[in-house]
Amino acid sequence: TDHTFLWTEPRSVVGFWFALEDATLDNGCLWALPGGHRRKPARRFRRAPGGGTTMEVLGDEPPAGDAEAGFVPLEVRSGTLIVLDGLLPHYSLANRSQRRRAAYTLHAIDPTAHYPSDNWLQRNDLPLRGFRDRR
């Protein structure tokens, strides 16, 4: 889930996936678990004390990413926007076709949410700030 990597308190991350080309089963479309956003966070990727990163297990592991676990393909046409709740389990498979599957991905978090200092995605010399902090 995106919340695993972009942790905020309270949870606020939303993913935006813009299909720049058709995304199909052949070229590696996204797959998602219907209702999976209602689950509690299972993991958190964070900076480890002393350097490096670690995956902290918080609860039950999310189901494996396959159709047998209930994941469904999100085949879409070029120009489609898929909005992903931060807790929604999703993935894509390898593109096994000769066609590209270009997409643009953007994540947004609430600028009033707390972004912990041990989140892996940040630079101490360039702190993450919300738009409201700009002067």
Language-model-derived ranges and their functions:
Residues 1-4:
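Short acidic (Asp/Glu) patches
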Residues 6, 72, 94:
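Short, flexible, glycine/charge-rich loop motifs used to bind or transfer phosphoryl groups or to couple energy/partner
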Residues 7, 65-67, 97:
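Sterically constrained small-residue positions within well-ordered secondary structures
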Residues 7-25, 54, 75-78, 83, ...:
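Short, conserved beta-strand element in jelly-roll/cupin
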Residues 19, 70, 90-92:
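Hydrophobic alpha-helical segments, principally membrane-spanning helices and signal/leader peptides
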Residues 25-88:
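Double-stranded beta-helix
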Residues 42-47, 81-83, 87-135:
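Non-heme Fe(II)/2-oxoglutarate
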